[in-house]
Amino acid sequence: MWINVINLHKCTIIKLIKDISWRDIMENIKDQNKNVSYKTRTLVSTALFAGIICTTIAYFLHVPMGGSGEYVHVGDAFIYLAAVLLPTPYAACAAAIGSAMADILTGSANWAFATIIIKPILVLFFTSKSKNIINVRNVFAAIIAGILGTILYMIAGGIMYGSFKSAFILTVVGLIQPVGSFIIFIVIGLAFDKLKIKQKIK
């Protein structure tokens, strides 16, 4: 009797195993691995961009200006690059972390709070879905980001100084920042497009 029961269970288990679609299971495992791999690559790329943004803002053509920790730089170009190469939420994180770290490392920690708010806003105008970095939308996005960033920092400066006149004067002097960042973004973007960077990192 027990032998018959065991044989019955054995036949049932074998039938269940045969009925399972192993191909579907393997495809699901592959899909999950792809998702994990994509997420891992995206997180690593985000951290890398945060480091690049921090370095370029803090040390590459970094020009101190004024006596309250202000400075001009062209590191925003790499925020724009992050915005066209990474999904928007990740680009925003890279922009906030990298830029705020640059403020802290260069003795401008008083600007870090404003930076954490302003820099992520700049990435919202770009698209990372196009096969090319330089396209009509991203060119206009770089222009808008430069203008908006300048205005927002002027407002932040006015609040910090208690004088919008002083903030406006420093903003006019610092117009090299959005202009320089725009030019560098276009130059690097065109070079990357020629090398088909976006297709290679997908």
Across the structure, where does each feature detected by a protein language model lie?
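Loop-helix junctions at membrane interfaces
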Residues: 2-202
